[in-house]
Amino acid sequence: MRKYLYCENGFVEKSQWMPNCWVNVECPDQSDFEFLTKELKVPEAFLEDIADMDERPRTDTEDNWLLTIIRIPLQQQGSIPYITIPIGIITNNEIIVTVCYHSTEMIPDFIDHTRRKGIIVPNKFELILRLIYSSAVWFLKYLKQINNDVAAAEKELERSIRNEDLLRLMKLQKTLVYFNTSIRGNEVMVGKLQSIFQEKDYQNRDLVEDVVIELKQAYN
């Protein structure tokens, strides 16, 4: 599923693509792949990289394209309620595409937030930074829930040692490790992006500082 988003005091969905809009793709199907690779000429290798669940935060280039991969938190059903997943931001001079192979809460919330606050996102660097900032906000939200779950599991273990409580605690602790690794990786990406987007038009030190502070707060 893809959406074409234009920044008009926040991101507003439109019916078709035009240069400099943001194309957000979640759970891409064959139609989305064809649009991205045939119409926008997005490198297929980038889409394959984003599909790898183990991809770490990094950047890559091909011709005039830049791929930025960050990791974001995801709440799911099952024995492991929280995981982290990759999301790819693919850009060139006229195109901004985000691709995620899962349906997330973060992206719709981010879009709604820009509308509520009337946020203007003037360029691709700021969009990437704001998405990283949003990831930190959601990491913090889920970390609070995880810490509450850990405290509850530890309390249960004090009463009686049961295998299911011990396994639950181990899974939650493993999730914390994954979260911390992803947050640190995203923080490193901010520095890399600053070195890539050095032109004056891309400079926004206040936003960079806010992103780094939020990531450090999320780091457990």
Residues of each region from the PLM?
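Peripheral, non-transmembrane regulatory/ligand-interaction domains of membrane transport proteins
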Residues: 1-219
